[in-house]
Amino acid sequence: MKKKMIPTTILLSALIFSLSPICEAVWLTVPHTGSKCVSEEIQSNVIVLADYLVISEEHSIFPTVSVKVTAPYGTVLHHRENTTNGQFAFTTQESGTYLACFEADAKSHGNKDFSINIDWKTGIAAKDWDSIARKEKIEGVELEFKKLEGAVEAIHENLIYLRNREAEMRIVSEKTNSRVAWYSIMSLGICIVVSGLQILYLKQYFEKKKLI
């Protein structure tokens, strides 16, 4: 029985890995003047979890940064200053682009660029499956099925989001095309009116000069 469960578990793990978002650490090189940002377009009601760590090549100088995470409409979700590492977590309230910016603190980096390692997770990848397994008292294949169910649900929600975005973009495109058509008609009408006025003016001018 155990021999049959092992291949099944491996297969489920492979399916979850292929369906789930790939979570890799992002490396940013922050200039000693200015800031560097990372962003991701996320739909609403999605869990976001991220850890960040400043990496310095010189052990004598350990730079600090100011961190600000904002929602699509500018709401500040996380803000820290003079820090070398930290974590932020939130559940998105609206769909759009979420932005995390890192700015070097003055006189803490020796006027040299440095790097930041960011482990950014969203959706099913941000869930604490160990806690879920302990809470629901599940393990093995049952836990893998739970992960697979979450992955399928996340993909389904993402497809719905993409379909809604496509519908919104189509409406915007149709409105834009309609406005361009009206603008073209108005431009053509103005050109015709201006041409008629010019002809009328020239006719009156030549009649006044008795040229015609």
From Swiss-Prot:
Keyword Transmembrane in record: yes
Q: Which residues lie on this side of the membrane: Cytoplasmic?
A: 201-212
Subcellular localization? Endoplasmic reticulum membrane; Golgi apparatus membrane
Q: Where is the GOLD domain?
A: 35-147
- Which residues point to the Lumenal side? 26-179
Q: Where is this motif: COPI vesicle coat-binding?
A: 205-212
Q: Per the UniProt record, which residue ranges are transmembrane? A: 180-200
| Positions occupied by motif COPII vesicle coat-binding | 205-206
Q: Principal place where this protein is found?
A: endoplasmic reticulum
Q: How does it assemble?
A: Probably oligomerizes with other members of the EMP24/GP25L family. Associates with the COPI vesicle coat (coatomer). Associates with the COPII vesicle coat (coatomer).
Name this protein carries in UniProt: Transmembrane emp24 domain-containing protein p24delta4
The gene name reads CYB
